[in-house]
Amino acid sequence: MDQTKPPRRNPLAFTPWPVTLITAVVYLAFVIPLLVIHHVVPSAPTSSPDGLNITEAWNDLQVLTAGYRPYNSRQNDKIHDWLLHRINEILGAAPPATTDEKKPDVFVFDDTRSNLTFARDNLAVYFEGTNILVYIRGEDDDQEQWWELPEGSPKGKGGVLVNAHYDSVSTGYGATDDGVGVVTCLQLVKYFTTPKNAPRKGLVVLFNNGEEDFLNGARVYSQHPLSRFPHTFLNLEGAGAGGRAVLFRSSDAEVAASYMRSKHPFGSVLGSDGFKAGLIRSQTDYVVFEGDMGLRGLDVAFLEPRARYHTDQDDTRHTSKDSLWHMLSTAVATTEDLVSDTSDRFDGPARNDHKIASGTGHQAVWFDLYGSTFVLFRLHTLFALSVTLLVVAPIVLLLTSIILTKVDKMYLFRTSIRPEGSLEVLPLYGDRGVIRYPFLLGIPTAVTIGLAYLLTKFNPYIVHSSQYAVWSMMVSVWIFLAWFVSRVADFARPSAFHRVYTLTWTFVVMWVLQVIATVYQDRWALGGSYFIFFAYAGTFLATWISYLELFALPRKSEYANHLRPVSRHASSHSSRRGLSEEDEEDEDEAPTESTSLLGSRQRTTFANYVRVNADTADLSDSEEHTQDVNVYGLEQRWSASLPKWLWLLQFLLAAPIVLILVGPIALLLTGSLHQTGQDGSSSLFIYIAIVALTTLLLSPMLPFVHRCTYHIPLFMLAVFAGTLIYNLVAFPFSDSNRLKLFFIQEVDLDTGLNTASLTGVQPFVHDVAVGLPSAAGQNVTCGPFGDRFKCSWTGIPPHVLTEDKPVEEWLSFEVSRSIDKPRHAQLQISGQNTRACKVVFDSPIKNFHVAGSAYDPRFPHTYAKGIKEIRLWSRVWDNTWTVDVEWFNPDSSSDHSKTSGSLTGQVVCLWSDYNQPGTIPALDEVRQYGPAWIGVSKLADGLVEGRKSFEIA
């Protein structure tokens, strides 16, 4: 057959245009839907399902978010009363029982009795709750009202708890934090009191108050008798302002299985690992229910955008009915599955003393696929599969290599071959491309890391508003450099083994990553590395196919014998050249009209060396002009036997699985972290995370990128140039992506001096502070405050009392030292128009007691190293707290001993009600005169703190 006759074009061949088009189409086909799903919330139904009313829920949300409702505000009391009214309305409108369907019994508890003292590290809290509980009795529940008995306890299987908190921060309307959760709970009451939806197991719906100020409401719930009934829970939260509700924590696989009922699942176990590893520092009521009380449950929350979280943009204008429906539908589906479960999997020995006997489950791995399918399996299953594949995959590749060697088809790593019965050495060039991978991977990755440091130095917060500009910059330069390096390598040393060597290197790297991931799975129960396992499996299969592909090659001995019958001219020419590509050039043929303008088929490299197809050096003059059309370019002649379409199978094994699993993680991680720099988190971390994710997402194209045409890489170069300039010079904040600054005003009630301050990142916080009218002409002082800077100035005096009184009357306290007990004293503290005060000690105290307080061994109220601060919360206004304290012996060897027996500190009261204009003029001023690109949030529990000093001699 005439090898010079061009074959019919194969649309799947490993040639530039098919590779370019297929690679681009596959990446776009998987990435675009991910972006759409991440940013577009499923539409709410036009008509409400039976037992639910979306319009009613939206109207409730508008009422709920009419004002700021922190625990320490009058608006909070109004919402408490409104919730009781709405619950009674819903129960009154519930459909009546029928002959076939029984209406469940419902009990509403307005808990104005429970209180608790607890401590965490050197901070102690006394809290009086105003939680509202709705108990919908299940068909299988104990029919007695056991909670009314002095020692009453529930019988039978445990129930289900659904929780949302109805308080908000003092600077935010709390539409998603946690208004959507609250109205979802109201709809759950409506749904499960409909006779046909009556639960098998009892349901407790908790509207807790005080979450924003240290998870106080959830902790005090533990003191209600009904808290002993639920064994599982669903916590509804918000740490953003819209979008999809994300499942970001689950205690085990068994309870996570109930989430599978959700029509639009969304989330990854990687979020749970972030909490375990301490990367996410904020907490929700989940840690109280699961960690302190021993329940097993789920944490579902809105996570982005963080710029609106805890600000006045967390309102109904910036969320939607679609977001409301996403959380509501998820809650209904999950709760319905939990209350229908009659198995014993949520019953068993308590994990610790005094905790709920809910048994133990199995660590879980979960993630969603394109927002429609929920994948769930146990962590030990992932561990077993990981260990198995870590052992099996290298063995399979090793055995395949041995078989290839046995059948004389192992061309890999072979530079030459000596034909049998001959002293002549013939080149194979099978080692070409073996060391390319470190450069292919290392150069693009190193450059993107350099860009991460460049942005951190010159414009660290650009990711706050322009995360996709950062992504575009990283992706475009990575693609261009990977293509450029591979093309240079392919130009200088063309090799048909580029794919197999690159895949082999990738396999080795993935094997190392899988070892690390498996160790973390075993030691720290972190399942977020699941994507590494699947990527490793895909890489292994693609690599194995490359090795199996070698069986299509001729035996090396046969190939060598094919090369032997050459002319003496070729032999002498070959011996002159040896095996090096850098030997002298062939003598140029005489030019004719048909001669190429470049002269023969040789090419000159950048070092002025001749680029020659090595195999043509071993051919006779006649054979040299008969190039096999099945050989691509100047690659090795034996590559003509390799299949031309297997690359597509390898690409489909390696790339899509990475895009499907790593893509959502990249979007979720970016969405939840790109605006955390304003909170003091490292900007470099998010940039390095983007670099790592870019490398993971694009590395599957490395075995194939050298075949791509120049069109897309050059376009990527243009994109890189534009985005680099933008990312370096653009202002990082905007009206829709505001910088969050944190406000507090501190008043010295002994002297009347007040200091207003803003806390945030430099230089922006200073620029905002000095631009305020009241700060004009003042020396605005800025200094480090944790990971941020705090800028202070003398502010406009606040008006936090309902009537004008001297500041020294805002709070009062009396101190009396015990006569018969050394180092004991009693403080009586009262604040005007507030129900929150605290005592801050200059040195830690040993012990304390608040009159009327309850104690619970699950919540220790002391700390071995002493207590520095006691926070006091009352459900009534203008309350007087009585606090007995004991401090350390100054003569003891304790680290906290003082040189004298005195105790010093400050009594502080808080004011957080910002619903009336003019109450806190300094905050009004920041909002009125601050630039449009800032948002204001609270720095501490109170917007205004008034303090007086004390000394107990």
Curated annotation (Swiss-Prot):
Indicate the transmembrane segments per the record: 17-37, 383-403, 438-458, 465-485, 500-520, 525-545, 651-671, 685-705, 712-732
Alphabetical UniProt keywords: Glycoprotein, Hydrolase, Membrane, Metal-binding, Metalloprotease, Protease, Transmembrane, Transmembrane helix, Vacuole, Zinc
Name its cellular compartments: Vacuole membrane
Q: Where is the composition biased (Acidic residues)?
A: 581-591
- InterPro entries in the record: Fxna-like_M28_dom, M28_fam, Peptidase_M28, PFF1_C, PFF1_TM
What are the catalytic residues?
211
Give its E.C. classification number: 3.4.-.-
Enumerate the glycosylated residues. Answer: 53, 115, 779
Cytoplasmic domain ranges by topology: 1-16, 404-437, 486-499, 546-650, 706-711
Q: According to its UniProt record, which cofactors does this protein need?
A: Zn(2+)
- Say yes or no: keyword Protease present: yes
Membrane topology note: Multi-pass membrane protein
Q: Which residues lie on this side of the membrane: Vacuolar?
A: 38-382, 459-464, 521-524, 672-684, 733-953
Per the UniProt record, the lineage of the source organism begins with: Eukaryota, Fungi, Dikarya, Ascomycota, Pezizomycotina
Q: Specify the protein name.
A: Vacuolar membrane protease
The protein's role, per its UniProt record: May be involved in vacuolar sorting and osmoregulation.
